């Protein structure tokens, strides 16, 4: 039996097995084996070229993928926000290649990818879906682009991403596995875990762990535990935009918001836009900035003063050392200390080391050996 047939057989058995406490361990093993087989198939297809794909060279400080079914307005949106020139049409399958555009915002260069419109079954390869989804996996943020008239597409889009191991708006499970030489599998938990020991051990054995110490924090489900021991899961934040709001009647607004709630999206979190009329785009840009966690660092350059025109862009939580690494050159090996003025400093020109955590709009001066 080939990998694809094996996967189909496992999926069928899982679907036909009722889930309860007595079948939990069995289903856990089946799901773990399914994840393992899918990972092997993914590696096999990648190794054989996978049918061309959509190789996109990433540029800028962050990459954002616009995800939506055909003709929801992704091309119009990227053209309105960037200097891209994506063909726009009022019919499906207009975008045949990935069209990157660069958004300049608050001194940052944010690459937006207008990927070909997804169709149902993309994760299974329909419409070049696997190649498209592989591009999305490399992004820092995914934006779901929905039509105001087809809110139900959100569930289908989220499912396609989940099926290729993209986990949006989720933290990786806290699962640590350390191999050992003998004595089987020991399970250590924080006291909250509802899965029994047989289920946990069965999942780990399917993953190839025979002798290991596993530490699990929290109370992950079977699926989350499997995520925690797999290497091919990708975690990223997401935003939901609702396009074409210029075309709706005022009386339809309540229906649209109810539809969002029905599909698990708070209307307060959704961003309502009209790409055609360029409405709501400032709100979208600000929300993107926050979701990406970008911050601006103004460099104090010797003899030239503080450069506020072209800030160094790093991520929230990053340190002086991260800034030094991004600056490149010989600065890393010549580094002595740094001085910081701004939100992260206790006072102006505070002397700090490499591990000092920077904040948005800090002024940084690196003192280096000659």
From Swiss-Prot:
One of its GO terms (molecular function) is GTPase activity. PROSITE patterns: G_OBG, GTP1_OBG, TGS. InterPro entries: Beta-grasp_dom_sf, DRG, G_OBG, GTP-bd, GTP-binding_2, GTP1-OBG_CS, P-loop_NTPase, Small_GTP-bd. GO terms for cellular component: cytoplasm. Residues 293-368 form the TGS domain. Residues 62-293 form the OBG-type G domain. CDD domains: DRG. Signal peptide: none annotated. GO terms for biological process: cytoplasmic translation. GTP binds at residues 68-75, 114-118, 243-246. Keywords: GTP-binding, Nucleotide-binding. Gene3D superfamilies: 3.10.20.30, 6.10.140.1070, P-loop containing nucleotide triphosphate hydrolases (3.40.50.300). Pfam families: MMR_HSR1 (PF01926), MMR_HSR1_Xtn (PF16897), TGS (PF02824). Belongs to the TRAFAC class OBG-HflX-like GTPase superfamily. OBG GTPase family. PANTHER family: DEVELOPMENTALLY-REGULATED GTP-BINDING PROTEIN 2 (PTHR43127). This is Uncharacterized GTP-binding protein VNG_1111G.
């Amino acid at each position: 039996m080939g990998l694809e047939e094996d996967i189909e057989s496992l999926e069928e058995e899982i679907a036909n097995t009722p889930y309860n406490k007595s079948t939990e361990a069995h289903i856990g093993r089946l799901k773990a084996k399914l994840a393992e087989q899918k990972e092997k198939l993914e590696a096999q297809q990648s190794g054989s070229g996978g049918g061309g794909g959509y190789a996109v060279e990433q540029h800028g400080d962050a990459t954002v993928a616009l995800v939506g079914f055909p003709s929801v307005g992704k091309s119009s949106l990227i053209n309105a926000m960037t200097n891209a020139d994506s063909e726009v049409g009022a019919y499906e399958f207009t975008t045949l290649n990935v069209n990157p555009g660069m958004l300049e915002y608050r001194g940052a260069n944010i690459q937006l990818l207008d990927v070909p419109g997804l169709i149902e079954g993309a994760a299974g390869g329909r419409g070049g879906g696997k190649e498209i989804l592989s591009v999305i996996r490399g992004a820092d943020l995914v934006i779901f682009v929905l039509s105001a008239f087809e809110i139900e597409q959100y569930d289908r889009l989220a499912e396609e991403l989940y099926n290729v191991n993209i986990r949006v708006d989720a933290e990786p499970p806290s699962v640590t596995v350390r191999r050992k030489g003998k004595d089987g599998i020991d399970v250590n938990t924080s006291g909250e875990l509802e899965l029994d020991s047989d289920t946990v051990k069965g999942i780990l054995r399917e993953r190839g762990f025979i002798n290991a110490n596993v530490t699990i924090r929290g109370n992950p489900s079977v699926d989350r535990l499997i995520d925690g021991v797999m290497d091919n899961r990708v975690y990223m934040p997401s935003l939901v935009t609702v396009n074409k709001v210029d075309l709706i009647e005022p009386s339809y607004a309540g229906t649209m918001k109810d539809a969002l709630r029905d599909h698990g999206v708070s209307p307060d979190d959704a961003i309502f836009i009209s790409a055609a009329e360029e409405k709501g785009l400032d709100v979208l840009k600000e929300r993107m900035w926050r979701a990406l966690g970008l911050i601006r660092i103004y460099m104090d350059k010797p003899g030239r003063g503080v450069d506020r025109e072209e800030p160094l862009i790093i991520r929230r939580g990053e340190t002086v050392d991260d800034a030094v690494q991004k600056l490149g050159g010989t600065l890393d090996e010549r580094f002595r200390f740094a001085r910081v003025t701004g939100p992260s400093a206790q006072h102006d020109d505070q002397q700090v080391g490499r591990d000092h955590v920077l904040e948005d709009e800090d002024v940084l001066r690196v003192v280096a050996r000659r």
